[in-house]
Each structure stands twice: as C-alpha cells, then as structure tokens.
Amino acid sequence: MDNRVSGTTSNGETKPVCPVMEKVEEDGTLEREQWTNKMEFVLSVAGEIIGLGNVWRFPYLCYKNGGGAFFIPYLIFLFTCGIPVFFLETALGQYTNQGGITAWRKICPIFEGIGYASQMIVSLLNVYYIVVLAWALFYLFSSFTTDLPWGSCSHEWNTENCVEFQKTNNSLNVTSENATSPVIEFWERRVLKISDGIQHLGSLRWELVLCLLLAWIICYFCIWKGVKSTGKVVYFTATFPYLMLVVLLIRGVTLPGAAQGIQFYLYPNITRLWDPQVWMDAGTQIFFSFAICLGCLTALGSYNKYHNNCYRDCVALCILNSSTSFVAGFAIFSILGFMSQEQGVPISEVAESGPGLAFIAYPRAVVMLPFSPLWACCFFFMVVLLGLDSQFVCVESLVTALVDMYPRVFRKKNRREILILIVSVVSFFIGLIMLTEGGMYVFQLFDYYAASGMCLLFVAIFESLCVAWVYGASRFYDNIEDMIGYKPWPLIKYCWLFFTPAVCLATFLFSLIKYTPLTYNKKYTYPWWGDALGWLLALSSMVCIPAWSIYKLRTLKGPLRERLRQLVCPAEDLPQKSQPELTSPATPMTSLLRLTELESNC
C-alpha cells in the first residue's frame, strides 16, 4: 500500500500535508476519542435505547394493563424517573469524561460500587442478550425459501398433534387438548430442540452456535475501532429499523381485523390503575427501554465535547424512545387483530410478549400473508438490527469502563482491539450454555434475575442519592450549567432529590413483596437450586455497592470522620465552576439543598 501523502499547492509551492494520526499523551497513551459530530452520539444512544423491548414488551404491557390507561403510570414514571436518571447518567459521563466506573470514582469515591454494579449487570447482559440475535439470524436464514418452514406440519420435526390452524375451518372442532401448531413445533423442536428441564442441558445446537458466532463477529467489527467505527455503523443500524417498522405498520393497518387489534391495544380500562402491578410494570419498562443503570449512557456521554447540549439531546431521545414504543404497538397489534379474526379466537389467545411474540406470534401471522417469506425477512432483519446496536453499545460500555480504569494498559495502539476480542470470546463461550437443548431454561434465568427490574431499581436508588444528596444536586446543576450554558428545568433537580429515589424504592420493595419463582411457559417449575442460582445472579450486581463502600472505609487510614471526608469529596481535577456567594436570605429549601453536599467543604 502506498503510504505517501500528497501535498497541496499554494503560490506555486508544494507543501506536504501531514497524515491524520492518533494523538499521543506524554505518558505514551493514546488521547481519549470524541464523537466526530453530534449525530453520531444521538444515533448511538438511539440505537442502544430503541431495541427489542420497544417492539415485543411495551405493546403487550399496554394491552395487559388497561390499554390507554397504562399511559398514565408510564408517563408519570417517564417524567419522574426516566428522563431525570437518563439525563443524570449522560451528563455525568460528559462532565467527568470517564466511563461507567471511573465517573463515579471521580465525583464520589465511596459510591464507586455503583459503577461496578452497573458493569456487572451489563456483563451478564452481554452474555445472554446476543442469544436473541442468534435465534433471529436462524429465522432470517430460514425465511429465504418459497414456503416458510413453520407454515406446515409436513416436516420431520413435526408430530402427529401438529394442526395447521390457519388452514382449518373454524366451524369444525379439530383441535384437541394436545394439539399444537407448526410455529410452536418449529420453535421448540427445530430451533431449540428443548429438553424437559434445566437439569438436562443435552447437546449443543450447532446451527445456533454458528449464528451466535456470526452475531459476535458482526458485533466485534462494529466497535473494534472505538467511536470511529461505532459512529459510522449506527447511521445504518439505528435508522434502518424505522424503515422496516414503517413498512410493517403500513402492511398491518391495511389487513382485515387490524382495527379490532388496535382497539384492544388502546381501549382504556381505568380500573386497572388500582392494581399495583400495573405501576410496577410501567416503572420496570422505563428502566428496561431507556438502558438506565447499565453504564451505557455514561460511556456514550463521555465521548461528547464538554459544551455539548446533552440536556436537549436527552429530552429529545427520551421522547423519541417512548414515541417509537407507541407506534410499534400499532404495527404489532394490527397484525394480532388480523390473526384473531382469521383464526376466530379472542385476541388474548394470540397476544404474546418477549420471545413468544418474535418467534411464535409474529411468524404465525406472517404465514397468513401473501408473499410471506418477504414479510418474514423484513421482520427478522428488523429484529436483528434492533438487537445488534443495543448489543454492541453494551459491549462498548464495558470496554470503555475497563479502558478508563487502566488507561496505561489499554489506551495504546491495538490494545483496545485485543480487549474487545477477549470480551467477545469469553462472552461467546459462556453463552454457549444457552444454545444447548436445555439452554432456554438458562436464558430465562438470566433474563428474569440477572438484568431484572429489581437490580436496575436498586442501582437507580443509589445513583440519585449519590448525585443529589452526597455530591450535591445544586453543585451538579452548576456543573451542567457550565457545560451547556444554562440550568435545566428545576423539576429534574427535585426529581433527583425526592421523587426518583422515593418512586424507585417503593417499586423495588413492591417487586420484592410480589416476587414469584420463575416458571417456563407457566408449566415448568424450576428446581430450588435453579432459583438459588438466579438470586446469585441478581445479588452479584446489587452487593457491589455496599461491599465497595465497606471495603474503602476499612482500607483507608485515619479517623472515621476523616475517611468519610476523603470518600465523599470529588476529584480535584474535575472542571469546577466558580461559586458566587449567596446574597439573598437563606430559605428552608436553599438550606436543605446546601445540606445535600454534607457540608464536606470539598
């Protein structure tokens, strides 16, 4: 390859142009990268937060929890928890210029455990979330055929109980207690070859292993050059799913029965608001869909320029995320309404959530459409892209945290690429257990416990307490004003102080009280050691916060008061805005806000 650089001509003279090279610090480490432009940041965050949950979880929760009435608790959680915590994490990354662990070390060392907790959650998420991509790739490849393999009962994996419901005359009672559909048999007997329990893992499903390997290879090359590659990839992965969603929406609303499905999706049932479970579902959906408490927003925000208007970006992204969930509901329930009418069954019998929607309900609907392979390809390609950018941003979050913890080790030429490769290979091999014949039971354990709403709520409580009551809400607002040039809406500050921790704590306690052991398909009950393993996965993140605080208090020398003072003071190298003296008389509220900084004189 010719590495010579052409020159420029000025007044007849040729001047050499230096090649663009990575900047190197005095200690030999590479300078920390930044986004090339704002659009790369916006699309990266959009790709992370707009994922599978918008398509397969939010619409079902609306239907299940009172239709349009569900928007009341959802919007309350959005404005008291979703936007405030989303903004807090993004602004924290931009202000400290650090990843998900060292950002917390910078502003409050005693709560560095928040960073470890979020990275533990994201590490577990990296292992199991990508398995969904492996399933989606398998379905995508299976869709390149004239007759979809889940459309009939004539394959070797089908049983004598298989009934093609979509071709059955509804007036005839051909179903039996053991009847099943070709879609379910394709999912359970062809894709998963599912065993009878977690105690029987069986052999690896090698076709899925190859799909998982392909997913990890794609993920690796999306982020291997840091934000330089990530920022370019998201132009496609974050925008193309919208095109697919619009196509599926137009097709869905033009089908017979679509209006019935949309009515079930939106018809308000106000009485459901008296059920605490509805409020818990709204809260956990906000945390799931906004990627809160995973360290991802902090990592992405850390690559912003210091004076980027992150407040405006965050509000716009939150509204975009919720709007996408709302629109996706029309696309999904118009199809479910069509299925309900075609099969002559109530919509409750075809409505699914989670993997059941993506790999059972929607494939069943696609079979009934003209040119079904085309619509199957569109849908599963959308699923792959929705999951892909969420996946590689989560990996980026973990890698950013590790690089910022050990910059002299990893912030050198090719070291980062090697680190990403190690993370990918280790996660790939751990994830293989979920591609065995009993792997679905392991996947459900990870999904139910490892990255559950309970874990995210626990971390969110300490995030708001740390920033608002230890570091100081007013101090952080001053830092934000220094970055963006003005102070955000005051309600966000009071959410950090009061509403967010209170709402998160109440929802967390309710989730503990209402806890029910995990089951699969409402039939299979996990053995006691399965639930014990699940709780270990959940506690592996939550224990990080108190454990780190105790560890730091015990290892520091000196009187307890002095140790506490050291552990609550922010790093001296953080940008600080000069504080003008207060000339107005103190009010109870201003006195309270000054107390939030613990009078540490930091």
From Swiss-Prot:
Residues 1-40, 549-602 are cytoplasmic. It comes from Rattus norvegicus (Rat). The lineage of its organism: Eukaryota, Metazoa, Chordata, Craniata, Vertebrata. One of its GO terms (cellular component) is cell projection. PANTHER family: SODIUM- AND CHLORIDE-DEPENDENT GABA TRANSPORTER 2, SODIUM/CHLORIDE DEPENDENT TRANSPORTER. This is Sodium- and chloride-dependent GABA transporter 2. It is a multi-pass membrane protein. Signal peptide: none annotated. Glycans are attached at residues 169, 173, 178, 269. It catalyses: 4-aminobutanoate(out) + chloride(out) + 2 Na(+)(out) = 4-aminobutanoate(in) + chloride(in) + 2 Na(+)(in); taurine(out) + chloride(out) + 2 Na(+)(out) = taurine(in) + chloride(in) + 2 Na(+)(in); beta-alanine(out) + chloride(out) + 2 Na(+)(out) = beta-alanine(in) + chloride(in) + 2 Na(+)(in); hypotaurine(out) + chloride(out) + 2 Na(+)(out) = hypotaurine(in) + chloride(in) + 2 Na(+)(in).
